[in-house]
């Protein structure tokens, strides 16, 4: 299975492509899509959409995983990130890809084993897990991390999160990937 991971951002969007063969992960590509900070917002969003659409055409992934938006201290920044994320998701959907979403906590838990890991720890583990010769930038590393998260059972986490309302009605919830009462 080929997975395209995305770390969305208005200025810089990271991407990472990997393949899962059984339990083995194989690095394919990573990098960033940059929008011109001097351009108007619609032009910047189009740059992201076009860039992601091109990644889908070039790498032909089976699915995509993307980091969920967090609420920033600055509401304006959160809104801009949400718009960038929307443009990215539309680019992914241009290829009719299934899109899976993960929180930063889920990503860090899957990659480092600790949900409060810092960016350096994520980068270091991405290098180790994918046997990379060089260290990817933080945006590309986060994108590879969200792809790793999906490859390591993220589908199960996403399905369990989708069941949360039904479980809550029965007095149950999912905590740390486990069903608790």
Curated annotation (Swiss-Prot):
One of its GO terms (biological process) is DNA recombination. The active site is at 7, 67, 139. InterPro entries: RNaseH-like_sf (IPR012337), RNaseH_sf (IPR036397), X-over_junc_endoDNase_Mg_BS (IPR020563), X-over_junc_endoDNase_RuvC (IPR002176). It is an enzyme of class 3 (hydrolase). It comes from the Bacteria. Its EC number is 3.1.21.10. GO terms for cellular component: cytoplasm; Holliday junction resolvase complex. Keywords: Cytoplasm, DNA damage, DNA recombination, DNA repair, DNA-binding, Endonuclease, Hydrolase, Magnesium, Metal-binding, Nuclease. Mg(2+) 2 binds at residue 67. Mg(2+) 1 binds at residues 7, 139. Pfam families: RuvC. GO terms for molecular function: crossover junction DNA endonuclease activity; DNA binding; magnesium ion binding. It catalyses: Endonucleolytic cleavage at a junction such as a reciprocal single-stranded crossover between two homologous DNA duplexes (Holliday junction). Binds 2 Mg(2+) ion per subunit. Its main location: cytoplasm. It is found in: Cytoplasm. The RuvA-RuvB-RuvC complex processes Holliday junction (HJ) DNA during genetic recombination and DNA repair. Endonuclease that resolves HJ intermediates. Cleaves cruciform DNA by making single-stranded nicks across the HJ at symmetrical positions within the homologous arms, yielding a 5'-phosphate and a 3'-hydroxyl group; requires a central core of homology in the junction. The consensus cleavage sequence is 5'-(A/T)TT(C/G)-3'. Cleavage occurs on the 3'-side of the TT dinucleotide at the point of strand exchange. Homodimer which binds Holliday junction (HJ) DNA. The HJ becomes 2-fold symmetrical on binding to RuvC with unstacked arms; it has a different conformation from HJ DNA in complex with RuvA. In the full resolvosome a probable DNA-RuvA(4)-RuvB(12)-RuvC(2) complex forms which resolves the HJ. PANTHER family: CROSSOVER JUNCTION ENDODEOXYRIBONUCLEASE RUVC. This is Crossover junction endodeoxyribonuclease RuvC. It comes from Ralstonia nicotianae (strain ATCC BAA-1114 / GMI1000) (Ralstonia solanacearum). The gene is ruvC.
């Amino acid at each position: 299975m080929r997975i395209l991971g995305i770390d969305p951002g208005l200025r810089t969007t990271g991407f990472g492509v990997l393949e899962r063969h059984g339990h083995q992960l194989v690095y394919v590509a990573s990098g960033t899509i940059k929008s011109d900070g001097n351009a108007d917002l619609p032009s910047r969003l189009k740059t992201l959409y076009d860039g992601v659409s091109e990644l889908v055409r070039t790498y032909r992934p089976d699915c995509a995983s993307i980091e969920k938006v967090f609420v920033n201290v600055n509401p304006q920044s959160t809104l801009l990130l949400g718009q960038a994320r929307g443009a990215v998701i539309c680019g992914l959907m241009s290829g009719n890809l299934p899109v899976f979403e993960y929180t930063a906590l889920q990503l860090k838990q899957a990659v480092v084993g600790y949900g409060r890991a810092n960016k350096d720890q994520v980068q270091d583990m991405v290098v180790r897990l994918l046997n990379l010769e060089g260290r990817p930038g933080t945006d590309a590393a986060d994108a590879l991390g969200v792809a790793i998260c999906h490859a390591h059972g993220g589908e199960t986490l996403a399905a369990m999160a989708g069941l949360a309302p039904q479980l809550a009605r029965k007095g149950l919830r999912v905590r740390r990937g486990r069903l608790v009462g």
